A protein has these predicted regions:
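N-terminal secretory signal peptides that target proteins for export/translocation
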Residues: 1-5
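Bacterial N-terminal signal peptides
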Residues: 8-19
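Long, charged/polar, soluble alpha-helical segments
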Residues: 24-190
Length: 190
């Protein structure tokens, strides 16, 4: 009995120690160091920062398409999962930044138009992946959850982005938006 308890304690200790390690491995930063630097450099420029998040999310989907079309790709299912996860993390960060700028009452109408266009593009690419007929079921099961989650998030967000743009247009008519976000880009072409 005592040996069994001792054994159980050791197993539990090992599981608890391994848990944070495996969790850290799953939640890596989807941004490269140069991308992090670019984001940091635009921290007070909503228009530029939001454009960067769209650009980075788009790059993950482009990389996904390239990887999936390459016949030499090894471990396609895992790479698909990881790129979709990176896309989801970047897209969530985009939405978090939108929320921040809305809370500050910044005028983000121009980047919202870009984001709405990107939403349509992202929806099409994610649906094409979901509807791909030539993918074995075993492969699909590896990334099906993250794909469904990403598609649901983009669908919901696209609707919210359109509503937010309408709200921003209305607020601009009543001059309720801060134009301070425009001062950094004043005189610069967009």
């Amino acid at each position: 009995m005592r040996s069994l308890m001792h054994h159980s304690t050791i197993v539990l200790t090992l599981l608890l120690a391994a848990g944070p390690i495996s969790l850290a491995q799953r939640h890596r930063d989807p941004l490269t160091q140069p991308e992090i630097d670019q984001i940091r450099d635009t921290s007070w420029e909503p228009r530029e920062r939001l454009k960067l998040y769209v650009e980075f999310a788009r790059a993950r989907l482009v990389k996904l398409e390239q990887m999936r079309s390459d016949p030499k790709t090894k471990d396609r299912a895992t790479q698909t999962h990881d790129l979709l996860d990176d896309f989801q993390l970047l897209y969530d960060e985009l939405n978090d930044n939108i929320d921040t700028y809305v809370d500050r009452k910044d005028d983000i109408r121009k980047p919202l138009k870009l984001i709405i266009e990107a939403d349509t593009e992202f929806q099409a690419k994610l649906r094409a992946l979901k509807d791909a007929a030539d993918v074995p079921a075993a492969e699909t099961s590896t990334y099906e959850f993250v794909l469904t989650n990403a598609l649901d998030t983009v669908d919901t967000s696209a609707e919210e982005h359109r509503k937010l743009l309408a709200d921003q247009e209305d607020a601009a008519k009543h001059k309720k938006l801060n134009s301070s976000s425009n001062t950094k880009t004043a005189g610069k072409p967009e």
